[in-house]
Amino acid sequence: MQSNRRDFLKAQALAASAAAAGIPIVVEAANGTAAPKTAADVAVRWDKAPCRFCGTGCAVMVGVQEGKVVATQGDPEAPVNRGLNCIKGYFLSKIMYGRDRLQTPLLRKKNGVYDKEGDFVPVSWDEAFDIMAAKWKETLKTDGPTGIGMFGSGQWTVWEGYAAAKLWKAGFRSNNLDPNARHCMASAVTGFMRTFGIDEPMGCYDDIEQSDAFVLWGSNMAEMHPILWSRITDRRLSNPHVKVAVLSTYEHRSFDLADQAMIFKPQTDLAILNYIANYIITNKKVNTEFVKKNINFKKGATDIGYGLRPGHALEKDATSNGYPGADGKPKGNPNDSTPISFDEYAKFVSEYTAEKVSEISGVTVEQLKALAELYADPKVKVVSYWTMGFNQHTRGTWANNMVYNIHLLTGKISQPGNGPFSLTGQPSACGTAREVGTFAHRLPADMVVTNPEHRHHAEEIWGLPEGTIPDKIGLHAVAQSRALKDGKLKCYWVTTNNNMQAGPNINGEILPGWRNPKTFIVVSDPYPTASAMAADLVLPAAMWVEKEGAFGNAERRTQVWRQQVSAPGEARSDLWQMMEFSKRFKIEDVWTAELIAKKPAVKGKTLFDVLFRNGKVDKYPLADLTKVNAKYIKDYTNDESKAYGFYVQKGLFEEYAEFGRGHGHDLAPFDVYHEVRGLRWPVVDGKETLWRFREGYDPYVKKGEGVKFYGHKDGRANIFALPYQPAAESPDKEYDLWLCTGRVLEHWHTGTMTRRVPELHRAVPEAQLFMHPDDAKARGLQRGMKVKIASRRGEILLAVETKGRNKVPRGLVFVPFFDEGKLINKLTLDATCPISKETDFKKCAVKVVRA
């Protein structure tokens, strides 16, 4: 059988991915030639599901035999990945079957009773929920709703996140709910909201096949989004005019394709962005008509601090960080801005000349000019991609705003092949954390708890009395850790994340709070992670296709899957855990008498009755479950619906969808998603939207409007004047190196799943310290030698790697964070972007010495 060119490219991408992980791939599988079917093959049932890993949203076919997932393969009908998977995707069938899978609740006990210093003992779900409910009720009585908190996930299904938002913000009346997406996507959210007044990318992956240039800012797509990278590679190699520019603080695998490769000093991306804006203006490449019609100019607050504790010297000196000043009043607001003119903006960026920015950043003048010309040339369609390099940044919101500035100045936005695109790291950081609104300040569909109209709208949809949802922003992720340490947060439920490994400054801020005698920590997880082992109660969780789910990917694509197999032992989904836990609370336990008086019908009811058996969520009978899914799986059911007697997922989804329909976040009817490979919202009249804000593509832009940034009432986007500022902590004489943390191709985040896949674990069994050979030589170190890396906060032992995939410049070291045996986040600083509250994991000062 002769392969066509696309098959060849797929085979090459697969082979490269496999080779990187040291795994052999059978040629027939790589080139798409099907092996002859056997009797065993016939017995395997196949069904669609989105991949469990990153936010790309690849789809796979899941093979089930005798109640177990036995195989997965790329879904050839999936528009995102077109049958191709990365190396992690090819081993999805093994992520649920680690030998140490948790199958029963575990509670710390001594002498038969709960004791924070006790050992883990298996208990029943009833006993687990009894102790949980007792701790929650005690805290609600003594501390009120601010004494409890939940740390969720961009890996929650859409309805798990929605159930959590209802339970916390409506049931417990606490906004202390935040997702681990705070660590990865919060700066993207605030960047979108400040510039456009509405969240999530205006473009889609279809841009790749229509663009002339790709610019990567702090994004190693070759390893972190390899399927999208394979599409960019195809575009670049098939079209000689296409260019790729890659900017990073160190050289990684994405540099292999780069026409323009730039290594810049940490934090100086801000200066480079302002230079590009200056170049566009001084060379008269501004799209004047577009700017006049569609843009407002603003100057942002600048002395905003670094999100450290209020007592830190950097926060005491800051004048606009929002912390209480000497008079007890907030010192400004880091999110503030004032209107300016185009001329004032032009003057502001004029100081960022090529020569000055070259000196600041270390990028040559020639490289800077070549990059700026890509953006400035009206004939070149450009897509900018970024991930954690921008977002995990003490000026992450600014970085997002500033890349939008460039696209808005040139009008290269909201059209095929042109646009800025924030890539996502988790499978539903967009669909669940952002769209559902599981952040401490958000409600569904971009609404916020501080807006009385938004609260009222949510209360109407949820059937709640006015005033139920609190108006004060809750604790964000880093603030939750600090509050636990300080004894202000007493009860804490952590699900579908591993913050004891992934969070910043573990020794200084996270572990002390979890082991604080005043706190009670619950972790829901499939495996005994670092977080689970530090908890007081561990709840075994179902994962991926052990439940019915939905994810929303980076291009606004919502994808649904059916439950394929049962979870082992007594493991249960996060959705079941939250709904079941809600039964333990009468409304009198959580609401004030005044609030209950506004709706007497709720008296004596449980939170389950009020939130989930409310006439809307329980609207759809079990017959719908069979009707929607019967042609795919005979006698289909799912565990949650079977437990509660109604189609739980459909009820939650349709209630949630009320928030977005008619408000620019329209979702299709629930049943439709079971038939298709996802749809990109807004979905209006059955049609998905590929490009937002532009007439002819977006149903919310009327005929004759051309471009309309309807997130803002005036239909305009904002360009912000924002300066380059240094990092919160920089190398000095003692701690003389920058530390950057991140990921590798073979492992995902903290390795909870990938390190339990034997092939992936063998490929990269432990984390290493990537160091420049000259830096190693100057310290008397050799490749493979054990060293101690230390910051002001902690130290760990690692082996030095002076070769390999990551080539760091002198003065910087890189360490991935997947290895629970080498907790690099003991060293990181808990500084955040003061606007987004997202942690900067890319910059702190360390030293390296022989162990």
Swiss-Prot record:
Its cofactor is [4Fe-4S] cluster; Mo-bis(molybdopterin guanine dinucleotide). Mo-bis(molybdopterin guanine dinucleotide) binds at residues 88, 155, 180, 184, 217-224, 248-252, 267-269, 388, 392, 498, 524-525, 547, 574, 741-750, 825, 842. It is found in: Periplasm. This is Periplasmic nitrate reductase. Binds 1 [4Fe-4S] cluster. It catalyses: 2 Fe(II)-[cytochrome] + nitrate + 2 H(+) = 2 Fe(III)-[cytochrome] + nitrite + H2O. Residues 317-338 are annotated as: Disordered. One of its GO terms (molecular function) is electron transfer activity. Predicted to be exported by the Tat system. The position of the signal peptide cleavage has not been experimentally proven. [4Fe-4S] cluster binds at C51, C54, C58, C86.
